Amino acid sequence: MRYTNVSILLGMLVIFVSPMVFADDLTPIPEGKPQVVQWFNTHVGPLAQRKGLDPALVAAEAAPRIINVNPKGGEFKTLTDAIKSVPAGNTKRVIIKMAHGEYREKVTIDRNKPFITLMGQPNAMPVITYDGTAAKYGTVDSASLIILSDYFMAVNIVVKNTAPAPDGKTKGAQALSMRISGNFAAFYNCKFYGFQDTICDDTGNHFFKDCYVEGTFDFIFGSGTSMYLGTQLHVVGDGIRVIAAHAGKSAEEKSGYSFVHCKVTGTGGGIYLGRAWMSHPKVVYAYTEMTSVVNPTGWQENKTPAHDKTVFYGEYKCSGPGSHKAKRVPFTQDIDDKEANCFLSLGYIQGSKWLLPPPAL
């Protein structure tokens, strides 16, 4: 009789207690694309199923505030005004729901306004657009969207810089789409358009999933520690074209860019996967489809020969005609399973502490 009661009690616990997800920083993203969804759902579950998140984040997510923005009229007509309504020192998640339309604004989210989410609809994505250039604002401040705060999230939005493409003659023609300088930022199904320096992936831990990034030269650059999962990297224009310019300056730095299950596309050919803007760049492409637009050498030759020994350019189980390694530069690392796992798990971006899925609204 005693054992029967215990069995009943255990059964009730199974029914009524929700499973808790301890996000695993060690389990790598699987090689098979069909398994990626299950991997994500297992390790990036919603707040109610999670343990180990930062306490400040848990408190912030307890009672989110929702703001509606619509250029045609609503609670706020501009994104800038909506952000101004968030108090300095904010401690609560603020979800800014953006109606479909064009938001011609130069938007900055200050460091003292964490926990902000910009959210659009997947079939009617709002567009943040501006035409700032380095000549007017300085390179990193030319971005249409600048995020300085922590715990930022963007879902289903488009960000553009509509300044003309640099012609190689005009000084200060760099024009950023976005600069992300805050820690713990996630981007889901977002699109970024620019030419040179499209995204300044500046500093902090960042996660991009199912995104699209378009540019010409160094169009993802900075010192961020970022994972790009299932993201299309589309190269346009002509002349020398480079995707990633990671700004690592020493062997001790932990930052770097990891591109996983991405796709490299573009016009023309001769595209470089990355270059040594600084002495110690760290860039890895894993399970990535590389079309014929990729230069057979893969990576741009280093202008400083000493950098041949300090760069970390890794390729792991990539596919497509652009992934052939016969003509790769000699300083490319063909990394093994153990090395690859460091760039394939959430631990690379400290994901178990902060990474949440998009809000279900």
UniProtKB/Swiss-Prot annotation:
Keyword terms, alphabetized: Aspartyl esterase, Cell wall, Cell wall biogenesis/degradation, Hydrolase, Secreted, Signal
Residues noted as binding substrate in the record, renumbered to the chain: Q174, R275, W277
Known EC number: 3.1.1.11
EC primary class: hydrolase
Primary localization class, coarse: secreted
Claim: Secreted is one of the keywords in the record: yes
Tagged with keyword Signal: yes
Tissue localization of expression: Expressed in mature pollen grains in the anthers and on the stigma. Found in pollen tubes within the style.
A GO molecular function held by the record: pectinesterase activity
GO BP, sorted A to Z: cell wall modification; pectin catabolic process; pollen germination
Pfam families noted in UniProt: Pectinesterase
Cellular-component GO terms for this entry: extracellular region; pollen tube
Pathway(s) it belongs to: Glycan metabolism; pectin degradation; 2-dehydro-3-deoxy-D-gluconate from pectin: step 1/5
Active site: residue positions: D197, D218
Site (Transition state stabilizer): residue numbering on this chain: Q196
Cellular location(s): Secreted, Cell wall
Signal peptide boundaries: 1-23
Domain of life: Eukaryota
Function according to Swiss-Prot or TrEMBL: Acts in the modification of cell walls via demethylesterification of cell wall pectin.
Family: Belongs to the pectinesterase family.
The protein's name: Probable pectinesterase 48
Source species: Arabidopsis thaliana
